[in-house]
């Protein structure tokens, strides 16, 4: 961390995408049209608004994306309620990055990777997944096990089905908690699905999500 990470920068929320009923993805740029700072996969940043408050959020976009920065945020409190109510063009402040991030250039390099996520827990992992996709030659097979309450609650579902599922060397396993009309995939909780899949224990595992503490 250096002194620059402590200084809030004014940014513009240029786009807001509704991912699920309670998750939106916010795209930000400086007033000059640039990313506010560089980051590593897995790092986070503080977003604040005077008179409302501030909160720490995972940076969802990959560092390889040089055009903008994104945050996928679940509505679950004062700051997130306010964020979910704003419109594109709103200015906020951001500072960071914070955290160590994932060791993508050391421990993960050359390894077979297993990502396990539940609900909004995919948001912090999306950054490193897309980083590994960009530098595909540096990593082995990539397995992704992801689940949520329903199909409607699967974050980044379009990106998963349109991009991740179609790439060689990437295996995606989706599940939802309960039967749902129109869903022909796996049904069940993520921890149980992982046990069914019986993944190779030699894989390097990256995991995020409250429902996964019993794995």
Q: What is the predicted role of each segment?
A:
Residues 4-5, 78-213:
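FNR/FR-type flavoprotein reductase catalytic core
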